[in-house]
Amino acid sequence: MEKSFPQCGKNSTDFSTAWKTPLAAYFLVGPTASGKSAVAHCLAQESRPPAPLISADSMAIYRGMDVGTAKPEAADRAAGPYFGLDLVSPDQPFSVGDYLSAIHAATPEIVAAGGVPIVVGGTGLYVKALLEGLDPPASHPAHRAAAEAILAAEGLPALQAAARALNPAEFAKLRDPENPRRVIRAYELLAAGHPLPTPA
């Protein structure tokens, strides 16, 4: 399908500003190992000029995780251009907001590559964020301060317990609960009555 990136809110990546005009892009999405990467590569190479490829896969962002992630082969990547691959090491936290920021930072290169970009991947949250942008819940300084105070005085386990007590079902959704920054944000959202974002 062909879609255009919409105007995004002030808290999200604004592709229309980055490209000066709304960006048309093709989206090829599906589950891992369904063959979409190979199809996207062929389509990109048949385009004139060759179309840039933007990965929307939450596992392909990790350097060194090449087995089981269906990353394009080295020869295909050399024929590229590819974006959104090998952005961080596996031990680094990485959110959908970080993904949008990375793609935004790459926009000059994507534009310079020419052709209509092809977004390929199977992470629905990444695809949704590219199409609709992100509008994260508002900050709640009082709740954040309370979380930071618990962390400073009693440590991460106490903060985890406090956040879990606010909403056990929602807290169970938290990705990387050993990351203090994420637990602080979870406490802030749950104390304000917000659900946690769906994990990528």
Where are these regions (language model features)?
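Phosphate/pyrophosphate-binding catalytic cores of soluble transferases and nucleic-acid-acting enzymes
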Residues: 2-8, 12-200
